[in-house]
């Protein structure tokens, strides 16, 4: 048991973690150290601190890690081009290992024997938190109330919170599980659990629905250095400010809405509606620049790496040796990913409107259909003969077998 011991709680102030503080105190008789990791969630963190203390926490940490989140988690994933199942830009997945890292650091600082989290027993986050914590310190005990308590639904949690006098910002009539950070906002649960239901227009927090945006297109210029975005519209910005600026630009143009039924790590499908305006712009711009500067074989292999990288991040394996090794490969591919991309934004659409790089492998003189000295069109005949040789041999062999069959009357 943990009677009298310290337990570090990953605290968000939302429904799940709001009821965990009194529950832990009732069932473990322990001291609660609430830790809110600021990854850019759009909430009043002063209110969260007061709420945690009022709920029974003895101490509250609010850790601002936005800069670290962008530089050490978002940008490496962007450079990898990692997208889960073709749509999901991994907003929640990237934040969880960083949160776990801070929980472990504070547990060490406070001498806590255990870490608790509010992830459900059906979701991916329980895996991400616990695998990350164990990768960093396997001696720390982990408490996952959702897997052991008597509360079986969000409605049960609401009733428990009311009984304990804990204010919560949801009702039984409109229950969405919302996760937000600097990179994205995700919406799950409620009427979204039926994939036939279209998301209500008022669900969106940072993206204006495309049908409500201006009829005029807007252009945005994004500049990269070695795969890292550094400027927007010619202005150098810090990593955090750059994401915020692109969220504003993309959001007002209806960019970045994704509705996805995804395959969870734990084996079931779930539906999520995501808002990722800055991420959408950055992924498209980064890819357009790679088209210019990467050779064919590197680009094709990097596509395979991107898929594996996305799976590792989604599955909570951020601190795995393989992910570290893939980072080394990706960094090598990004040495020449420097240049400017111009994007045209119109009612939720993002259209490439130009790209340039000092390391571009595209040469207009080589690519032209006119006369040139580098490419001799007569050379194409020999290339075609060799390239298609295996098919030619196959056809000749089949013709020979057919003639033989006819000769023997088969």
From Swiss-Prot:
InterPro entries: Arginosuc_syn_C, Arginosuc_syn_N, Arginosuc_synth, Arginosuc_synth_CS, Arginosuc_synth_type_1_subfam, AS_cat/multimer_dom_body, Rossmann-like_a/b/a_fold. It is an enzyme of class 6 (ligase). PROSITE patterns: ARGININOSUCCIN_SYN_1, ARGININOSUCCIN_SYN_2. It comes from the Bacteria. Pfam families: Arginosuc_syn_C (PF20979), Arginosuc_synth (PF00764). Its main location: cytoplasm. GO terms for biological process: argininosuccinate metabolic process; L-arginine biosynthetic process; urea cycle. L-citrulline binds at residues 88, 93, 124, 128, 177, 186, 262, 274. CDD domains: ASS (cd01999). The keyword Protease does not apply. The keyword Nucleotide-binding applies. Keywords: Amino-acid biosynthesis, Arginine biosynthesis, ATP-binding, Cytoplasm, Ligase, Nucleotide-binding. It catalyses: L-citrulline + L-aspartate + ATP = 2-(N(omega)-L-arginino)succinate + AMP + diphosphate + H(+). It is found in: Cytoplasm. Its EC number is 6.3.4.5. ATP binds at residues 10-18, 118. GO terms for molecular function: argininosuccinate synthase activity; ATP binding. Pathway: Amino-acid biosynthesis; L-arginine biosynthesis; L-arginine from L-ornithine and carbamoyl phosphate: step 2/3. L-aspartate binds at residues 120, 124-125. Homotetramer. This is Argininosuccinate synthase. It comes from Caldanaerobacter subterraneus subsp. tengcongensis (strain DSM 15242 / JCM 11007 / NBRC 100824 / MB4). The lineage of its organism: Bacteria, Bacillati, Bacillota, Clostridia, Thermoanaerobacterales. The gene is argG.
